[in-house]
């Protein structure tokens, strides 16, 4: 496995790993919805996903921004932070 992933930046690998984890959680939730075959339970599972999705997004963005923070000015970091906040506000309202 090290041979296959040897040239990949560790930060990019971490970010991609978080996205794979997120997709596994989503797939598991879909299977749970199908197995339970109940709308009420499906809504509960879906509400849990509403928490997991933004959490993975925030962690992934934090990992990436932490890695490139030294290369960016404070103004650009503020713009990125503002953009992330606006994305989260748009999703939840």
Curated annotation (Swiss-Prot):
It is found in: Cell membrane. The keyword Electron transport does not apply. GO terms for cellular component: plasma membrane. Keywords: Cell membrane, Membrane, Transmembrane, Transmembrane helix. It is a multi-pass membrane protein. It comes from the Bacteria. This is Uncharacterized protein YqhV. It comes from Bacillus subtilis (strain 168).
